[in-house]
Regions:
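Short, motif-level signal for alpha-helix interfacial/capping segments enriched in acidic residues
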Residues: 1-21, 144-150
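Catalytic beta/alpha-barrel core
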Residues: 3-8, 26-40, 53-93, 102-116, ...
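Catalytic cores of alpha/beta
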Residues: 14-19, 64-75, 111-123, 158, ...
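Surface-exposed amphipathic alpha-helices with a cationic face
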Residues: 20, 47-51, 93-100, 146-153, ...
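A short alpha/beta connector and helix-capping loop motif
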Residues: 35-70, 165-185
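Charged helix-capping and loop-helix junction motifs
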Residues: 39-47, 118, 140-149
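Glycine-rich phosphate-binding active-site loops on the catalytic face of alpha/beta enzymes
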Residues: 84-88, 129-139, 173-194
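Positively charged, amphipathic and often flexible ligand-engagement surfaces
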Residues: 123-130, 148-153, 178-180
Length: 199
């Protein structure tokens, strides 16, 4: 899944076209409000501008009562991840998830996979997004132990810190989607990264 905020829109589209013969492709859209996480993301209208993408997932790093949710839920996104930590109670979370079948949960890297699975069991959520890094903070040393993904049967989208070695590790794992950003693709070694990904 290509991270939309990591490059110019036309470069995202070109990368999508070059990789689509080799991977099940998606575009990953980050929405941030500057409060829930200390950065800003793209606007919801950008989702419906991606006419080439067969699958779009939204990672909403925003408060659960942000008015932007109305616009987000109007988009054509296939999956929309709302942060478990943004809700004041599980009842509020459950009520929110009932608004749209596309809504799933995202988690900051404070929870073990077992804890996430237990939460998803309680809330009847069949897939989740895992922030391998804390959201919105560029330079971090700690990284989630992705070996523990073997402990869940749910589909997991891994966002943050994905490297070429991570892609190789999970390339043949159908229940894991990796968000490809600046560490794996969109950097000064772009062409070499592409060649590595398609070889």
């Amino acid at each position: 899944s290509l991270s939309y905020i990591c490059d110019k829109p036309n470069n995202i589209q070109k990368s999508y076209a070059r990789l689509m013969q080799h991977y099940k492709m998606s575009v990953h859209m980050d929405f941030m409000d500057g409060h829930f996480v200390p950065r800003l993301g793209v606007h919801p209208e950008a989702v419906d501008e991606l006419d080439y993408a067969e699958h779009i997932d939204i990672h909403a790093m925003i408060a659960c009562n942000n008015p932007a949710w109305e616009d987000i839920l109007k988009t054509r996104a296939d999956v929309i991840f709302a942060h478990y930590e943004s809700f004041h109670s599980e009842q509020q979370c459950e009520d929110f998830l009932s608004r749209d079948a596309r809504l799933k949960l995202a988690f900051k890297p404070y929870h073990t996979i077992q804890q996430i699975d237990t939460i998803c069991d309680r809330l009847a959520v069949d897939e989740f997004l895992l922030m391998a890094y804390n959201p919105g903070i560029k330079v971090q040393d700690a990284y989630y132990n992705l070996e523990t993904l073997a402990d869940t049967q749910r589909h997991v989208t891994v966002d943050g810190g994905v490297k070429l070695s991570t892609v190789q590790q999970f390339k043949d794992e159908p229940k894991v989607t990796l968000v490809a950003g600046s560490k794996v693709l969109f950097n000064d070694n772009y062409e070499a990264n592409i060649e590595c990904l398609i070889s």
